[in-house]
Regions:
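Patatin-like phospholipase
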Residues: 2, 7-74, 79-438
Length: 438
């Protein structure tokens, strides 16, 4: 007698009881869903995120950053998650973005972002003669004061210094290779790249229904168009700029998608210059030399603005994380970010690419240190989602982000040692120059 026949011979109550449990069994999830949200932070932010993810992936059994369920990226974080969603691993990102030793077609060249926005300059410059004549006419007729008349010239100012058109072009080429796609709708996982509509101030979740017709590469370009640095990006007749203008993380996009575990990476934090300095993490697994860190005000306007910017975006993120905890009490949220007492990430230039190897190694080692110090709490939280700490990897103090895959030759070891010495020397000279200037 099959199940259908047996149900017909049951009483009414027995049939209702049996039917009640069938759909519940059918809808039971076979595995937890995991999402990743990456905040922005310029080249420095991307460098930190690559180094941190390399440490996380090798230290956490059961976590594969290329096989998550939902990816959310803002600004520089959009570049990283778009690559992960296309199957490019953190180690491959490290090879192309940090080490520059991948295939030429996949190597990131920072010069892409340093080309002047000639088109913007020309377009705005062509407006200048008419604006000048209009201002002079107002002054001559006494309609406006000199300062008021000069305000008419503001439309001639470029909206961005550099062109980020290469972001769209290069990433479109990168995602056109076999096994990858530049179409949100063809990805195996969900990908959301958040930009900000310049005219309305609303968030634009590219990749969500109604927003998924836009090429991934163009969405990355829009999400990373920092006002003043890059011109706004026009998509479907609307102008879009950096997604961080609205929120720092935008993790709620994935949390609303009912994920079980939310991993968030935030690369920019305000520096606590009053705390005892935390400088244990370093290149060769040894404590870094202690350095005298000047007060924020002693660094002049750039330092004050940097601290202000970091404090503003971090306070927004803290409020967002508190909201997530109350709004999604059954979800596990893990935040990874630099230590506020660590001067290494603070002293680095947010838009610098020169120190990428040193900073990526620092992020890698600091993340490993964080996992060791928080292993008790993290183990319990991660275990619910089938993820465990790899203690052998975490306890191996000789591991490095850029360690060669095989034993180097004598010449190779000499070159590696020389490179380390030169990196240390460059950092020492830069620090001395900063201290001397103050």
């Amino acid at each position: 007698m099959d199940r259908r026949t047996s149900l017909l011979h049951c009483s009414k109550n027995e049939r209702l009881h049996a039917l009640h449990f069938v759909p519940m069994h059918a809808n039971t999830k076979t595995r937890p869903t995991i999402a990743l949200a990456l905040a922005g932070g310029g080249p420095l932010g991307a460098i930190y995120e690559v180094g941190a993810m390399c440490a996380l992936e090798e230290s956490l059994n059961g976590l594969d950053f290329t096989k998550l369920d939902h990816y959310v990226g803002v600004s520089a974080g959009g570049f990283i998650v778009a690559s992960l969603a296309n199957g490019i691993s953190p180690r491959e990102l490290c090879a192309s973005f940090i080490e520059n030793d991948s295939e030429p077609s996949e190597t990131f060249d920072p010069s892409w972002l340093l080309k002047p926005a000639y088109g913007e300059f020309v377009r705005r410059g062509m407006m200048l003669p008419g604006l000048v004549l209009s201002a002079l006419w107002d002054i001559t007729l006494g309609r406006k004061s000199l300062m008021s008349a000069l305000e008419r010239l503001s439309p001639a100012l470029p909206t961005g210094v550099f062109s980020n058109a290469a972001v769209d072009t290069k990433m479109a080429q990168l995602f056109s290779r076999e096994g990858r796609t530049n179409d949100f709708r063809q990805l195996k996982a969900k990908l959301t790249l958040v930009a900000t509509n310049l005219d309305s101030g609303d968030s634009a979740p590219f990749g969500s229904p109604g927003w998924d017709h836009v090429p991934i590469s163009q969405a990355v370009q829009a999400s990373s168009a920092l006002p003043g640095l890059f011109p706004p990006v026009m998509i479907d007749g609307q102008y879009y700029v950096d997604g961080a203008l609205k929120k720092t993380m935008h993790a709620s996009v994935a949390l609303e998608d009912q994920v079980d575990l939310m991993i968030c990476l935030n690369p920019l934090v305000p520096f606590d210059a009053t705390a005892r300095q935390f400088t244990k993490v370093m290149q060769r697994g040894l404590p870094a030399p202690k350095r005298e860190i000047p007060r924020i005000v002693d660094g002049g306007l750039p330092s004050v603005l940097s601290q202000t910017f970091r404090s503003m975006i971090h306070s927004r993120m803290e409020l967002g994380m508190k909201h997530y905890t109350h709004a999604y009490p059954k979800k596990d949220i893990i935040l990874i970010e630099p230590d506020h007492r660590d001067p290494e990430m603070y002293l680095a230039n947010t838009f610098s690419y020169a120190q990428r190897r040193h900073l990526a190694e620092h992020a890698y080692q600091q993340t490993r240190q964080m996992l060791r110090s928080r292993k008790t709490g993290l183990s319990a939280k991660l275990a619910k989602h089938g993820i465990t700490l790899n203690h052998d990897v975490l306890d191996d103090h000789k591991r490095h982000l850029s360690a060669p895959p095989k034993a180097p030759t004598r010449i190779g070891r000499a070159i590696a040692t020389l490179q380390e010495v030169m990196d240390d020397l460059g950092e020492t000279v830069a620090t001395a120059a900063r201290l001397t200037a103050h």
